[in-house]
Design a protein with these regions (language model features):
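N-terminal secretory/targeting leader peptides
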Residues: 1-168
Length: 168
């Protein structure tokens, strides 16, 4: 309650933080470290352990709470004309290489995250894993407010929640 958390200038994100009792403050990403250092904010959201370690944010905090509420997708795109100019065999080769690269990238990302997590813990920061069910319940009003306004309908939210539950 009352934790000042760095937020994007997004009503959706601000409402999400408010729903769990936090005080969202819009802070530019480049000002995040200094804002933690000067106690303008108490927390940073939406960052990975890679960013936490690389940005040295762990130097300014005592705790990291693993909420897993953000997922940062990476995209590979190709010009449609270029794709269509490839033979079906070449398209198959490109798709296979992409699929293999995705698996490899995920493996490497998890390895780096584990290394960074260990380094952060070794620096004296306590990492806390939380049961996010309470947070998800608090977010229901946010889902209700934004469903249909950001390109996601109620059915999509239900499917995401079901997929998430299956992973637990």
């Amino acid at each position: 309650q009352g934790v000042r958390v760095r937020s994007h200038s997004s009503n959706l994100q601000s409402d999400s933080f408010a729903a769990i009792g936090a005080m969202p403050l819009s802070v530019a990403w480049g000002d995040t470290y200094t804002s933690l250092q000067q106690h303008t904010i108490d927390a940073v959201s939406g960052t990975t352990l890679t960013n936490m370690y690389g940005g040295k944010f762990y130097e300014q905090v005592k705790y990291i709470t693993m909420t897993n509420h953000h997922f940062i997708p990476s995209l590979v795109v190709m010009n449609e004309d270029l794709w269509n100019s490839l033979s079906s065999e070449d398209q198959e080769i490109v798709q296979k290489a992409f699929n293999e690269a995705v698996v490899y990238q995920r493996e490497i990302a998890f390895e780096y995250a584990e290394t960074y997590k260990n380094n952060i813990v070794d620096s004296g920061v306590e990492i806390i894993d939380v049961d996010t069910a309470e947070w998800a319940e608090a977010m229901s009003s946010v889902y209700d407010k934004y469903v249909g306004t950001v390109g996601i309908d109620a059915d999509m939210i239900t499917r995401i929640q079901e997929a998430e539950a299956a992973l637990q």
